[in-house]
Amino acid sequence: MAYRKLGRTSSQRKAMLRDLTTDLLINESIVTSEARAKEIRNTVEKMITLGKRGDLHACGQAAAFVRNVIASADYDEATDKYTSATALHKLFSEIAPLYADRTVRYTRILKTEPRRGDAAPMAIIELV
């Protein structure tokens, strides 16, 4: 096959890719194994491209993949309520406008020292 199986069944692999993609969109940088970083790079690129398109269909496609997780919660003293933004909202309102002039490669993979314990090659994947 043309893709990495990452030692998981297809459903486990898809769930892991969704989780890592959502985490990267929320935190803008994560530490993971090198193989996982190379694999989620493709999905993150697709999500940011959908965010740049910005239409309703692109929003629906991104919502089908990105987890519905709260990215940030801010307290509004005037209304005495918390306002929260999901990962999908952050993708379309904060991340996509940053890459309006860029066409490809929205992520960067930096190799780090091997993981302690099993010496797996580790990497930091971050949004450029």
From Swiss-Prot:
Stored InterPro entries: Ribosomal_bL17, Ribosomal_bL17_sf
Residues in coiled coil: none
Gene3D superfamilies linked to this entry: Ribosomal protein L17
Gene source species: Streptococcus suis (strain 98HAH33)
Gene: rplQ
GO biological process: translation
GO cellular component: cytosolic large ribosomal subunit
Signal peptide: none
One function term, GO molecular function aspect: structural constituent of ribosome
Annotated family: Belongs to the bacterial ribosomal protein bL17 family.
Self-association and partners: Part of the 50S ribosomal subunit. Contacts protein L32.
Matching HAMAP family: Ribosomal_bL17
Entry keyword set: Ribonucleoprotein, Ribosomal protein
This protein's name: Large ribosomal subunit protein bL17
